[in-house]
Curated annotation (Swiss-Prot):
Glutathione binds at Y8, R14, W39, K45, Q52, L53, Q65, S66. Conjugation of reduced glutathione to a wide number of exogenous and endogenous hydrophobic electrophiles. Cannot metabolize 1-chloro-2,4-dinitrobenzene. It comes from Mus musculus (Mouse). This is Glutathione S-transferase P 2. Residues 2-81 form the GST N-terminal domain. It comes from the Eukaryota.
Amino acid sequence: MPPYTIVYFPSPGRCEAMRMLLADQGQSWKEEVVTIDTWMQGLLKPTCLYGQLPKFEDGDLTLYQSNAILRHLGRSLGLYGKNQREAAQVDMVNDGVEDLRGKYGTMIYRNYENGKNDYVKALPGHLKPFETLLSQNQGGKAFIVGDQISFADYNLLDLLLIHQVLAPGCLDNFPLLSAYVARLSARPKIKAFLSSPEHVNRPINGNGKQ
C-alpha cells in the first residue's frame, strides 16, 4: 500500500508539482479522484479542514494546503536545501512561484477572455526574477537554489510548463529558464511522468482553459 494518498480533482492544478516530486524521488502514491459533481454535492467539503482540496495523507498524517504538503515532502525527503540559508532561499523562491500562480489562477478562472492578452504582456516582468535567481546560482546550470533539487524546483517547473502552454515562446528571452525547463524535464523519472497518460490526459485547469 503506497504511504501517500492525494485526494484531488481530475486536473493537475495544485497537485502536479507534488506528483512530479514524488515521481522523481521514486515514491509511489495513490490517487483518490473527486469529480466536480461529487464535490458539488457538498458532502465532502465540510470534512476538509479549510473546505478545499487537495487533501494529502502520509500514513496517519493528513495535510491540507498544497504548499504545506510540498514543504512536508521537502523536509521528509531531503528536498529543502542543505542548510538554513538554502532553506530560506527555497522558501523565498516557492513564495515567488505562488505569487505568480495566484495571478495565473485569477486570470484563468475569472478573466480569461478579457485578461489573457494583458497577462501575457506582463509575464516577462514576472519571469525575470527567476532568471535572475538562476544566474546567481552556478551560472544557471544547476537548480534554482544550491546544487541539489528542492521542492521549489518542482513547483517552479510546473508553473513554467503551464505558462509555455498559455504563451508558447514565453521563455524565448530567458535562456537560463528555458534551459532549466529542458534540463529538469529530461530527468528520467520526470520525463516518464510528463509523458504518462495520467499527466497528458488531464486538462491543465478545471474549467478547460489554458
